[in-house]
Amino acid sequence: KIDERNFDSLMERLLSEDGIFIVDNGASSFVPLSNYLIENNAIGMLQEAGRDVFIHCVVTGGQALLDTLSGFKALAEQTSTNNIVVWLNEFFGAIEHNGKAFNEMKTYAENASKVRGIVRIAKRNPDTFGRDIEEMASRKMTFGEVIGSSDFSIMAKQRIKTIQKDIFAQLDEVGF
């Protein structure tokens, strides 16, 4: 069990230090961190202190679609920010339910006012792009680290650059 009081030191840093912060938490800490942020009105506190808060939420296709849609819905309903960036990850399948795309779903329609933007990670060839991304992720490398690494072939780097350009262009559209 995660002691949510430990998030206090994170909040201290977010409030006292300058710069851009990215809090990348995994599935095991998602619920405790969400509870902490909501119960303590932490997002409101950060905004009152002049901090811009963006929450990135992943919705993934395939078997986890309904669970990740439920997570998005809960997050949107429980937070006061209108700066949610939804990442639609098609790696495990299309983001589609009962013949409807994400932006046609009731869950999205009811919470669209909370969404700052949507970034789509398109399903690509799993033998090339998929393996390159898996390798990058397993090594916990950034796009720049892969591109500068001698461990990746020229074509693997080209595929990584293609994905990077696509994602960065979509992030530019979100307008941070």
Predicted segments — roles?
Residues L14, V59, L171-V174:
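Generic structural signal for hydrophobic core residues of well-folded globular domains
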Residues K1, K114-I118, K140-T142:
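Active-site regions of enzymes building and remodeling cell-envelope glycoconjugates
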Residues K1-F30:
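Nucleotide-state-sensitive switch-loop elements of NTP-binding domains
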Residues E134-F176:
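NTP-binding/hydrolysis catalytic cores, primarily Walker-type P-loop NTPases
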Residues S29-R131:
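Conserved catalytic-core segment of NTP-binding enzymes
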Residues N6-S9, P32, N41-A42, K100-E104, ...:
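Exposed alpha-helical structural elements
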